[in-house]
Each structure stands twice: as C-alpha cells, then as structure tokens.
Amino acid sequence: MKKILERSMEGSGTWQGLVLVGIVTWICASSYLKFTHKFRSLLQPWVARQVVGGVPLILRIQKCQNGVLDAFFSGLSCVVSVPFYTAFLPLLFWSGHGRLARQMTLLIAFCDYLGNCIKDVVSAPRPSCPPVRRITATKDEEDNAMEYGLPSSHTLNTVCLSGYLLHYVLSSLEYESVSIQYYGFALACLLVALIAFGRVYLGMHSVVDIVSGLAIGVLILGLWLTVNEKLDDFITSKQNVSSFWTALSFLLLFAYPTPEHPTPSYEYHTAFNGVTLGIVTGVQQTYSQFHHEAAPRIFSPELPISSYLGRVMVGIPTILLVKFCSKSLAKWTLPMVSNALGIPIRSSMYIPKLKGYASGKKTDEPKNSVGYLQKLCEFLSHDSFDIDTGIRFFQYAGLAWSVVDLVPSLFSYVNL
C-alpha cells in the first residue's frame, strides 16, 4: 500500500509539473509569435459581419418590447450572472452540499476564464446601439456591455451550470425515474432558451454570440462531466494541491490574452481566479473536518433551518470583514514587495498615489540593476504591471478561504 501511495504521489507531481511547464511555454510562445493577433485577424472580420447582418432580426424581436418583458429578461439575466452565483456559493457550502459547491465554483471559474479569453481574443463588437435598443437595468449589466460580444457568457454559463446541476440531482437520486429525467432536461432547456432569447431581446448579443455560447457550453459540459470526479478527488485527497493551484492561478493571470481595447473581462477573471484558489486551498486543508460527504446537510436533524439561518447570520459579516482586511493587507504589502523586487507597478483604482505612472527603480539607475523580473516584464511587452490585479486577486482569495475554512471553524466553535 505504501508503495502504491508513493507511486501515486510521484505520478501526480509529474503531471502537475507538465501542466505548469506547458502553460509557461504557451505564454512565451504566444507572446513571441503573436498568436492572439493572428487569431483575431482571422476571426474578427467574419464575426463582425455576422453581428451586422443580425441587426434586422434583433430589431424585429424588439418590436414586441414592453415593460413586463424588459423587467422579466433583465431579472432573469441577473439571476444567472456570475455575481449572483458568487453570492450564492457560500450559502451552498454552508448548507452541507460541499461537493456540489466545489464543482460549481470550479466550473464557473473555468467557464468564466475560457469565455472571457475567447471574447478578448476575437474582440468582436456587440450589436450597434442605436439602432438596437440596449437595456442595462443594473450596474453589472452596464459593465457587461463594455465587454466584447462573442461568445455570450450568460448562455455559456447557463448551459454548463444547469446541465451539471441536473446531472448532480439525477445521480443523487436513490432510484432512476424516466419522468424526472425528462422534466429536468426540459426545464434546463427552457431556462437556456429563455436566457438566450433574453440576451437578444435586451440588445446585448447577436445570434452568432448566442450560438457560439451554446456550442462552447455544450463542449465544456461534456468535458466537465468526464473529469469532475477525478478533479474533486485530486482537490480533496492528493498532495501538493495548494502549491500547485497557487502556481497555476499565478500563471493564468499571465496567460490571459490581451484584448484589442481594455474591457472588464480581465478583472472578472482575476476575481474568480482568486475565489478558486481560496476555495481549493481551504477545502484541501479542512476537508476531513467540514466538507466530507457525511457532513450534516440542511433540513436534516443535524442541521435544521434555524441552525442554517444562524450560520448565514454569522458567516456573511465574517467573510465581508475578511474581504476588507485582505484588501487592506494587499494594498499595504504588494507595493512594498514589488518595489523591493524591482517590478514596475501602477494603480488605476486602489492606490491613488500610483495612478497614471509606474513606480519602481529611478530612471537614472543602471538598467542592469532591475533584475530578471523586470526583464520578464519587458519580454511580455508590459512597461509596468497594474497592482490592482494583485490586490483584487488576494482580496477574493481571502474571502473564499474564509467561506470554507475560517467560517466553518466559527460554526464549530458556536455549535451551529
């Protein structure tokens, strides 16, 4: 048995190293060979023509506009948005459904990363407004409108998450029921259809965006249903998980493609990348205590609704406090570390004194004193790095870690 475990650990370390080396190789090769620019020059003109050609169909759909439909589709878009899922995930973890919550977190992160990468590689426009009427009922929708169009993230996410949730529910049933499978599948398809139609009705996407989001979502869902059990087993029971995921998260920040013009997509990815790291490291450390399959679940005698509401009342203020503290700590430490390592930095939001310029070594110092990290910056065509990326990453990593580690420890302490 001991030899088997040792071989498993060696094999795990080998593929982890290969994954990280592969990402580093991709970063260097794509930067040097300008893959993003080449892919964009091939895809963007065709997609732009499809978007322009789809405007008459959008206008015909919007002829049936009224206040009820505006409110319905706007509300539906909010319910299936990434911020909504992010707010919902802590409640799912605290309800005792740890495996479902882990898989939903990782799946959202994967969909968000891949979808936003494709958006920024293609850099295809959304339908022109006017003549299309674009409805942005919330600040989140206004931010979404600033992103590129293809693929539709709402459609992609809905396909993946509703499909996985259906799979989870059906696999959890004690007996198979054809009628439950049929109605569950029909309900998932109805939700996807409403989301897809709503994105066109709201003027946020053209048909080509919807179709691409649907196709990519189906491919991701098929892949996820194949690997989800192995991935969950790796996170909960293997070695080097935290160190591997930390390195992976760091490299994914560099592997993200550069869009034609800046959009909020990279900020969304950074935040959820931090969330994923916090969840993975926290679960890996406390799985046997709080997140195992025998953990009490909501509505069971061990976790009645009153205790669950108590968890929510304790947990929500705690994670918000941790987020604030993580942000403050990152704002204090990251600039000092960057300056000590000779990394040129700037801030567009969090640190006013760094706005609009790079801070680092003085310009009259010899150039060979900046070290390899600054040479890496120059190789990746960055004059400086936005320190806000690191601050955003660490505050969301701290928030997510508190959801699965600190807060469950508090629950145990106060008998919730």
Swiss-Prot record:
Signal peptide: none
KW Transmembrane helix (keyword) present: yes
Domain of life of the organism encoding this protein: Eukaryota
Stretches that traverse the bilayer: 72-92, 104-124, 178-198, 207-227, 241-261, 266-286, 302-322, 393-413
Pfam families: PAP2
Active-site residues, record numbering mapped to chain: 154 (proton donor), 205 (nucleophile)
Cellular location(s): Endoplasmic reticulum membrane
Protein name: Lipid phosphate phosphatase delta
Protein source organism: Arabidopsis thaliana (Mouse-ear cress)
Lineage, uppermost ranks: Eukaryota, Viridiplantae, Streptophyta, Embryophyta, Tracheophyta
Gene coding for it: LPPD
